[in-house]
């Protein structure tokens, strides 16, 4: 027997190669590719062969019986019936580290700024991590965003999630740029989701600038990207922000916009045959939004913070839009920008009477809270008689509080207005509020 074994060893017989499971493409319908013959799980990445021999990256988004539904990351061109479908052999995680600071990536974590490859000593999951709600650190410290109206009247805490809600052309992106430049934070993660290509470059060069970019990571998925890439880019910026938070740093996440993330989810869900519900949004959209938002916030114990600000587009200035309504319910506050204030040249066009910060009372002093309430009350009293003043129908002396509100109104307007390049630190903003309402 030993002689036979020696003879077999001398022949150097190798095991046959393991066959790679291969499927084939059977249909293309809109955004969906249909594949059979290869067992793939949901969320798995795969490659589809094109007519010229190149490969198109896609992801499994569903299945029915023996048919697997794929959605490509890029535009699906050059596909033919019977094309090979192979499971992706690359890693589903990404290496991240300090080298990511000042870089711009897409929804797959690939650099798009032409400055070479990215790497690091930690593994970044493409899915935002979940934190046990009982272990999340509470919101206890104010976050200085450099905007007087927010610092004084709608104070945001470190670890809070807030929405900037407004119609188109009211100044959401401009205000977001001001917050980006002036917020006191260690790291800023910016997600530009569904934006016009022109606005992406303008935001990076003008709003962020060279100094702001040094402490920022920008995730880009413009409007011409596939809906799957827009969804993945939104989740990617949350994963990046959570990574730096868990390293003990104070992180500000800016996502522009949550509405376009919901629209991308709608495109994916409708392609899979999910029935439309409220204004064409399938039910799964409103179950995915809370999962995304809850991945933001503070981490466990005494680790760093992750504050998040989302822009929310109110279609037709409708504050009862389903995405706006859902965001208002799941966020820790909302800042409403109105077209009326914008048309009057009031920048930022923040309507403090319609806005609220749910964490403000626990991060500021009682004196600060009282002064903010007095200013809101003065705005409300002035609003009741605003139409009477130009007509000469308002008669002073009937109500001393209303008289004081009318007298204070020009000073309140001046206090709440701010130039796009003007910095308004937290302490001077609060001192100005207290002095005006004393």
Where are the predicted features?
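N-terminal accessory targeting/assembly segments
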Residues: 1-103, 108-112
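Phosphate-interacting basic helix/loop segments used at nucleotide- and nucleic-acid interfaces
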Residues: 7-11, 88, 145-150, 237, ...
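Active-site phosphate-binding and catalytic loops of NTP-dependent enzymes
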Residues: 14, 54-57, 92-96, 111-117, ...
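Flexible glycine-/small-residue-rich
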Residues: 27-29, 37, 50-52, 62, ...
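Detector for glycine-centered tight turns/loop "hinges" at secondary-structure junctions
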Residues: 53, 109-116, 121, 318, ...
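P-loop NTPase catalytic core
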Residues: 152-153, 159-438
